Amino acid sequence: MPPFRRTHKAPEASGSRLIEPPVRPSDDAPADSIETLVDNNRLLRSAFDTRIGDLRLWELVAATRREVLTVAAEYTLSYRDADRPDDIADWIARPIIMGGHQPELFHPGVWLKNGALDAYARAVSGTAINLVVDTDRCVHTRVGVPVGTPREAHLENVPFDAPADEMAWEERGIIDPSLFASFGERASRLLAPIEPNPILRRWWPLAVERAGECHRLGIALAQARHSLEARFGWETLELPVSEMVRLPTVMVFMGWLLAHGRALHEAYNASIADYRRVHKVRGRGRPVPDLAVRNDIPAEGPWFELPWWIWSRDDRRRRRVFANTETPGTLALSDMETLRVELPISPETSPSKWVDALSRMEEHSLRLRPRALITTMVARLLVADVFVHGIGGAAYDQLTDDIVRRLTGCDPPRHAVVSGTLRLPIEGLFPEIAATDPAAELARVHHLLRDLEFHPERHLLPVDAQPQEAKDLIGQKQRWIDTHPTATLARRRCREIRAANERMQFYTQGIRRDLLDRVGPLAAGLRARKLLQSREHPWCFFPEKTLKTFLLLENG
């Protein structure tokens, strides 16, 4: 059984952070630090004796680190300043701290990972690289702006571009430049009653500037954010995943995985099955769906799904990839719809043929892109000394760990986990938030309503002010309560008590009506408070000083 690790939980309090390991060791745990994790991971990687084609893994690692560092520096320097050491050999030998996320408007807890990349790299005199996961889907181009008060609030959906068919971020251009350019002003105006000075006002002009240069939606957002980080003093590099997977050394590793596709398929599904068993997960789609097998054409044999996506310039929908190896020395890939390509990829063919085949796909505008688990496998095995995950990624990468063990027999490098929670600072605008607790009050109202149903006598007027009928009903109920529930009387006893309760409801109508009148406003207030204080609001809705404090850039 794989050694699946415990699940992390997002911090609850605003401003709280989860950083494992810490940037620097504490007196209580001197061995728990990023420096120790780097050293341990290098020992784990040195134990890998797996051959990737005609290369040992460590040889491929050295070559990949050189390529990734070089290309990441060139990419970053295309839009902001970045440090590129003169001594390339020393640069490659230093620790590399890596992380990544989709180029969307994520919450501050995700952005904290980028701050941790910088802090970790400084602590070990290394280089931080953030992967822009532009191979993921661009699902929507609007943001929910919180509008209202703690009594009643809602999200106003504000678009930053016109809608389009779903496609990978790397393919998504900007459809309506004027809509994109005006987003900062429109969103800031709506947000003003809650947060009058969001960093959005300062940041969005950078996004508009980058959009005018790159003309790609996700890349414009990512480059603008990264440019802002430069003003914060963070010294990180960035690289889109779509660029990383085009590197020859990465193509060698991809080719090796594809050449052993059936083993990968089996390891992937076995790891998912073990994860579900260990964590008692019943849903077939959790944590990720199983890879399928199809037998659409019996004469061709089975087509087994692989953890990649495929699309073409003519049809940019990301589709699942199925592989067939019935022809010796050939790997057939298909979306089981319209795309089919045959590649000279097998355990017997050379890595140079793997690279040539994958390069030709790119030249013919066919995109073969790894899913999340394979992307982080590449980063963790070939490049990073430490990969920094958020909570969700850390949970998914337990599967990656087990897949690596099944394919290589070796333990993969360990990852770091960083997340945090920051809520909009609305207490100053609405002091009643601290003075009231609608959740507790709503629970009390529901308790009273239940008590009115089953114990109405507790809510009647004092005895000397009660009508005689009410007194009689109380007496009848008490006599039945005092009656021993024998087998013959149990049902009648229950009916009589219930009947007395129902008849007493006449005398508590006013109390019940007042309580019911409070349920709606309290529930609305609870929903409004949850919405306003959600941890999911985009980082750009927060004031700069609050963000800097949260991101470890300022004290206090």
Predicted regions and their residues:
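Glycine-rich phosphate/pyrophosphate-binding loops
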Residues: 121-142, 408-419
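Aromatic-residue-lined binding/catalytic grooves and analogous aromatic/hydrophobic interfacial grooves
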Residues: 190-355, 359-364, 370-371, 375-378, ...
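N-terminal catalytic cores of NTP/NDP-binding nucleotidyl/phosphoryl-transfer enzymes
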Residues: 92-124
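Internal, well-ordered alpha/beta segment that forms a basic, Gly-enriched binding/recognition surface
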Residues: 130-223, 227
